[in-house]
Amino acid sequence: MGYVYLLGNNEQENVYKIGITRGKIENRIKQLQTGSSGEIYLINYHKTKYPFFIEKNFHMKYYPYQTIGEWFELTSDEVLKFKEICQFFENNAKILEENAFAKNILK
């Protein structure tokens, strides 16, 4: 199990980090905070068996809006749909898991 999270930074409006951790999200925020002058804060998260798959799909979906690394310029509507999109990708992962030929996609 792991978490896909959506973080904000009070110095960058409409720019959000989409990442994953297998540990506590609070610890991940502390790690990221040391390299940032702005306050990093949690907006939302999704606990899942498929964190890598979901994160990869988010990054592909929002690639055109990528700023630096895992930070993306998103609209407020996209931020509000974070959980809905996580669930969509999770459902896709479950379908792929049942397909012997597609299992490697989840790794």
Segment roles from a protein language model:
Residues 1-107:
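Non-catalytic accessory segments flanking enzymatic or RNA/DNA-binding domains
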